[in-house]
Amino acid sequence: MKTQWSEILTPLLLLLLGLLHVSWAQSSCTGSPGIPGVPGIPGVPGSDGKPGTPGIKGEKGLPGLAGDHGELGEKGDAGIPGIPGKVGPKGPVGPKGAPGPPGPRGPKGGSGDYKATQKVAFSALRTVNSALRPNQAIRFEKVITNVNDNYEPRSGKFTCKVPGLYYFTYHASSRGNLCVNIVRGRDRDRMQKVLTFCDYAQNTFQVTTGGVVLKLEQEEVVHLQATDKNSLLGVEGANSIFTGFLLFPDMDV
């Protein structure tokens, strides 16, 4: 404590002596300036001053060094679907696939046209050897086949029940000249000659044959007709036969 007071009193005494010296010097007209006193001790720091005005914005600094890569973040949500792209080129044909399973059974079909399944056919022999008059219908009285009974053996005439295309043919044995007509028409009307087959031979056996396709209407009649040159035979070993059958029914009727 004594030391602190001595440190304080010493400078004060020196200051007092200086003041006395100055006062004496001022009272003397010819005194010289005294020696400068010892500097005083620093004063107590003052309080903080008011904040200054903001300074002018400085220039942009240089870019800093690149920082280290951060850790990988979590996967984000899916984005909105983009606009569909253009259609690409057609690809190559792929390999043939395996057969698929059988499909379900289809519905039952409708009833078919009875005409499409209609069957008409006949074959008949002539077994009598009697003479024939010109324009007379030639009877083939022994029936071999007569499906649907459209051929009448007692008259030798075929009557159409199913309109359509028919084929008629005959094989006739004779000894001498033979001419045979194939005729058609309504049985009640005048018959029309379609064609004539002739074969001329004297005193010798021969076989004459002919055939034709006819489009017939319902109830139209077809038969073979004798002429004035007729040596037709109907005996064992020299048979004559008349045949006809339906090729195609007329579906429009």
Swiss-Prot record:
GO CC terms of this entry: collagen trimer; complement component C1 complex; complement component C1q complex; extracellular region; extrinsic component of postsynaptic membrane; extrinsic component of presynaptic membrane; glutamatergic synapse; postsynapse
Tissue specificity of this protein: Highest levels in spleen, lung and brain. Weaker expression in kidney and liver. In the spleen, localized mainly to the red pulp, in cells mainly of monocyte-macrophage lineage. In white pulp, localized in specific dendritic cells such as those from the periarteriolar lymphatic sheath (PALS).
Signal sequence, renumbered to the chain: 1-25
Keyword Metal-binding attributed: yes
Pyrrolidone carboxylic acid PTM sites in chain numbering: Q26
UniProt biased composition (Low complexity): 78-96
UniProt-listed SMART domains: C1Q
Places the protein is found: Secreted; Cell surface
Bias (Basic and acidic residues) ranges: 68-77
One BP annotation, GO: inner ear development
Region entry Disordered, spans: 29-114
Domain of life: Eukaryota
Positions bound to Ca(2+): D199, Y200, Q206
InterPro entries xref list: C1q_dom (IPR001073), Collagen (IPR008160), Collagen/C1q_domain (IPR050392), Tumour_necrosis_fac-like_dom (IPR008983)
Sequence positions bearing 5-hydroxylysine: K57, K60, K75, K90, K96, K108
UniProt PTM comment: Hydroxylated on lysine and proline residues. Hydroxylated lysine residues can be glycosylated. Human C1Q contains up to 68.3 hydroxylysine-galactosylglucose residues and up to 2.5 hydroxylysine-galactose per molecule. Total percentage hydroxylysine residues glycosylated is 86.4%.
Residues covered by the Collagen-like domain: 29-112
Modified residues (4-hydroxyproline): P33, P36, P39, P51, P54, P63, P81, P84, P99, P102
MF terms (GO), sorted A to Z: identical protein binding
PANTHER family: COMPLEMENT C1Q SUBCOMPONENT SUBUNIT B (PTHR15427:SF18), EMILIN ELASTIN MICROFIBRIL INTERFACE-LOCATED PROTEIN ELASTIN MICROFIBRIL INTERFACER (PTHR15427)
Subunit structure: Core component of the complement C1 complex, a calcium-dependent complex composed of 1 molecule of the C1Q subcomplex, 2 molecules of C1R and 2 molecules of C1S. The C1Q subcomplex is composed 18 subunits: 3 chains of C1QA, C1QB, and C1QC trimerize to form 6 collagen-like triple helices connected to six globular ligand-recognition modules (C1q domain).
Function comment: Core component of the complement C1 complex, a multiprotein complex that initiates the classical pathway of the complement system, a cascade of proteins that leads to phagocytosis and breakdown of pathogens and signaling that strengthens the adaptive immune system.
Protein name: Complement C1q subcomponent subunit B
Name of encoding gene: C1qb
